[in-house]
Amino acid sequence: MDAKARNCLLQHKEALEKDIKTSYIMDHMISNGVLTVVEEEKVKSQATQYQRAAALIKMILNKDNYAYISFYNALLHEGYKDLAGLLHSGLPLVSSSSGKDTDGGNTSFVRTVLCEGGVPQRPVIFVTRKKLVSAIQQKLWKLNGEPGWVTIYGMAGCGKSVLAAEAVRDHALLEGCFSGGVHWVSIGKQDKSGLLMKLQNLCTRLGQEESFSQRLPLNIEEAKDRLRVLMLRKHPRSLLILDDVWDPWVLKAFDNQCQILLTTRDKSVTDSVMGPKYVIPVESGLGKEKGLEILSLFVNMKKEDLPVEAHSIIKECKGSPLVVSLVGALLRDFPNRWAYYLRQLQNKQFKRIRKSSSYDYEALDEAMSISVEMLREDIKDYYTDLSILQKDVKVPTKVLCVLWDLETEEVEDILQEFVNKSLLFCNRNGKSFCYYLHDLQVDFLTEKNRSQLQDLHRKMVTQFQRYHQPHTLSPGQEDCMYWYNFLAYHMASAGMHKELCALMFSLDWIKAKTELVGPAHLIHEFVEYRHILDEKDCAVCENFQEFLSLNGHLLGRQPFPNIVQLGLCEPETSEVYQQAKLQAKQEVDTGRLYLEWINKKTIKNLSRLVVRPHTDAVYHACFSQDGQRIASCGADKTLQVFKAETGEKLLDIKAHEDEVLCCAFSSDDSYIATCSVDKKVKIWDSGTGKLVHTYEEHSEQVNCCHFTNKSNHLLLATGSNDSFLKLWDLNQKECRNTMFGHTNSVTHCRFSPDDELLASCSADGTLKLWDVRSANEKKSINVKRFFLSSEDPPEDVEVIVKCCSWSADGDRIIVAAKNKVLLLDIHTSGLLTEIHTGHHSTIQYCDFSPYDHLAVIALSQYCVELWNIDSRVKVADCRGHLSWVHGVMFSPDGSSFLTASDDQTIRVWETRKVCKNSAIVLKQEIDVVFQENEMMVLAVDNIRGLQLIAGKTGQIDYLPEAQVSCCCLSPHLEYVAFGDEEGAIKIIELPNNRVFSSGIGHKKAVRHIQFTADGKTLISSSEDSVIQVWNWQTEEYVFLQAHQETVKDFRLLRDSRLLSWSFDGTVKVWNVITGRIERDFTCHQGTVLSCAISSDATKFSSTSADKTAKIWSFELPSPLHELKGHNSCVRCSAFSLDGILLATGDDNGEIRIWNVSDGQLLHLCAPISIEEGTATHGGWVTDVCFSPDRKMLVSAGGYLKWWNVVTGESSQTFYTNGTNLKKIHVSPDFRTYVTVDNLGILYILQVLE
């Protein structure tokens, strides 16, 4: 203790011992931490009051400066002001080193100054808000002894007063700026007499030693003058703190060149005073962690031990310090009421959350209500109108102009009043303003005006209808996004069911909205308002929702597809189809092109939802434990989280520096784990997307991650190419266990349903089971042995065990490797059953249904299969993905499953709907003959049988044959010819099905086959580089042999001549009667990929893998023109009917139109790239064809496109269900088109008349 302080205490020891009662004083000193309970007992043990006082003072004399100041403060608080006055002169300026409290500069000097100035103490339960406190202190430093105003403003209960007190609890600030002290005045809502009383009290405090202080000021003006004299002469470097100022006129009484810090709900209160002004808004509430910290302090528990309701309470409190403190104080009294208070918050029952405290109001609704009551009468109703705004929604000024029927400037003036009074918040975006309410303000208004809400929503809709037509809103309008997002909400809330149905069942609205915001929000609205929409027509609602769900991957892309054309692909009974047809017919009259898919009745779409959340391959996707959300990850290095029912995006996280290979929800859905090629494992908060942990102990890429199934103690397992498995406890920063045993990459891991075991799969050909508690290997099953034949040495056979999945009872496990799924008994390691999926594909992933015997299997040939694991029967074949399927997973209840693919999409399928699809799938080998009123399609199906399909009626004749590789029809539909994989060729006579077989055939698979015009001769080519000419009626053969490599294709010319092209880079012209070569053109360095012949048969074109195309004359050995400019393989070409134009298509999706006479480029037809690096046209352009008048061009690639040849612009796009179209067959009148996609779906399209 300082000598001055010690002497002062000794000097007045006798007076102190005579008068003080020690018990209350010791309470203060114990709470300050300067006296112990043991010391208190020693004092209490003394017999008389005098002896107890003497013992206490003796103890204080042996302590430090902090004990002296604590004793001084205790005397003040307990009413011994005269005795405290005796000790005042001995107060040390700073505490001694032994008792120094460096917490934010809160020294004993600071405590003394604040105590003298009447600054409130810290609340018993207190958490720091360092950023805001620092911001206030910075503004106070700016005053630097000069007059000025620092304003802390914010809504009711946001902690302004606590922040103001905390800001001055700083030694450096008080010593450097306010050495004259700090004086706190609580203002509140005052009239003139109340303000005069406040001023009188302040003058008395400041002028205690002045003679004129005996007479109080008689009016506000006198008080203002006296205050000015006191502040300038006696307290020149002091800070005046005015707490809770409501009215500007109040501040005029203090406007006398002082340094003032004030708290208020109304930012504009300082508009009426002079001098520098600084403003600190308190908008943001407490974060989740701070809120939990407050609750934990109130109930005296560790944060991690708080019940699950604590997190929900913080969420419902929206960060309000007042509400968190009120709830915490109530819970301290009633510790079992967590669920009750959560329910009151959720039901907006603020009246039931009441607690007396140092705050002026016992409940939040009281605090907010007083602010609203203070508004001018003429604008109160406008504030009531804001009751219909949704939380977290920023509303443009224009919306409120529509609602109130006022000019922009008038609306902005009204709203600024609300903003100034902290009843509304404003965001400036360029020249325009957006306004929003705090969540608690929304709750307060909703509860206060509950009886008026429907009328208020109706007013909003009615005003909208006065100003706008729903589908004519343009992106340039300031308010358009608000109406697209919330018009349906206002209609539903207004009870305007008829108007809501008209809106939601309008294709115009669907088109306009999806073009701007994508389909997910619309799907959400169909789900949200299903109960209303079903009142009109539940089938129509189903039609629209299904249309959006299944076309979501198209409707979210750029360029935006023609929604009317998509609608025409819906079933004819669908309301979407009927509206699209009506609209299309109107647009056809203005010259627009639309196509009808006339054979679509046979197609059933089995997916429930298709979403495209990624810009690259999707490697994994999984359901949350409640089945409400899906998380996905992939090659674009992101983690995406979206709603499982609607596809609405919830989180978009740039998760890793390299491809993300796997993701998993924790059992309580609180966290998502991701692992990556970058060797890292990361844990994310599944609600906020914040990074919680990063683990970096694997030395190679991490392939898989999986959480335990129970939430009582969360563990995460990861497997890596470094051959190790690791177990992670989320409460620890380092790996809990590393499991050694695999000799190659760990590809997959899964905890057993009871979490006792961990199964792991590896490229070493084994499945291992590990004891989770001890992290020891319990069992190793050699999966490779199930793939060995007797003659195979084990070391020569590589078996990568791709994945595993447990049965619900935990006794069995399925594993996938190569093309087999094996069901194993974990107790005996025995094989119970196996499923063989076929030789042509490998299994990528599999999952076991939680409630039945189904397994879903992803295959490399883009297909997903559902199998009954016990009966070994395939239950379903799910086609729809356009590339490899990397992941499959059942929902927790088994009612649906998801699939994730290289094609950037995730599909959700309903298990019960995906029954065995009896439709036979077509191969892409077809031939089409167009006759006057009919077309016939000859197709090869997946059982390698032949189907003869009447295009108009859809009637099918089956011509069963095995291993068909190609087929063709004779021009007059009298015969069918086909070649097979073994090189045999056959002809079937129609309609009696008599078969003629070629006696010679080819040595390898037949690839192309064609009748001559008279149908008497059949020409075929195969992989053996020979072209065979077979007059099947006379059994005469001619063999065209000269190509050095496989013949790519051929075309018949006039006069018994034939043009063929080959992988050897040459084009040859043959006489098919003699078998001689008439012309031999060495056309390209690379493979000749296609040739086209002009209609006058004088020219032909050749395209090549060398990125060029050439135009040739049959009479000249060198090309007429070499066409350069393509940046990839030129795969196809076609002449216009008059021979003036040539179109070429390449593997980048570009089509170029050239002038044949001079070889000049006329147009480049290239669809806009969807994503950087993605091929346009959905892939390679494989076929092109001009209309007879050469005004239009149709092209085949990933889908079909029609082009305006004059402008080079796209006229229409038809998105097929699958992709990779090989060829398009076009009728002579250019009105009918036939193709087959890679899913085996046949499209017969007709131009809509």
Curated annotation (Swiss-Prot):
The gene is Apaf1. Pfam families: APAF-1-like_WHD, APAF1_C, CARD, NB-ARC, WD40. GO terms for biological process: brain development; cardiac muscle cell apoptotic process; cell differentiation; cellular response to transforming growth factor beta stimulus; forebrain development; intrinsic apoptotic signaling pathway in response to endoplasmic reticulum stress; kidney development; neural tube closure. Residues 910-921 are annotated as: Interpropeller linker. Physiological concentrations of calcium ions negatively affect the assembly of apoptosome by inhibiting nucleotide exchange in the monomeric form. This is Apoptotic protease-activating factor 1. Regulates programmed cell death; necessary for normal brain development. Participates with pro-caspase-9 (Apaf-3) in the cytochrome c-dependent activation of caspase-3, leading to apoptosis. This activation requires ATP. Keywords: Apoptosis, ATP-binding, Calcium, Cytoplasm, Nucleotide-binding, Repeat, WD repeat. The lineage of its organism: Eukaryota, Metazoa, Chordata, Craniata, Vertebrata.
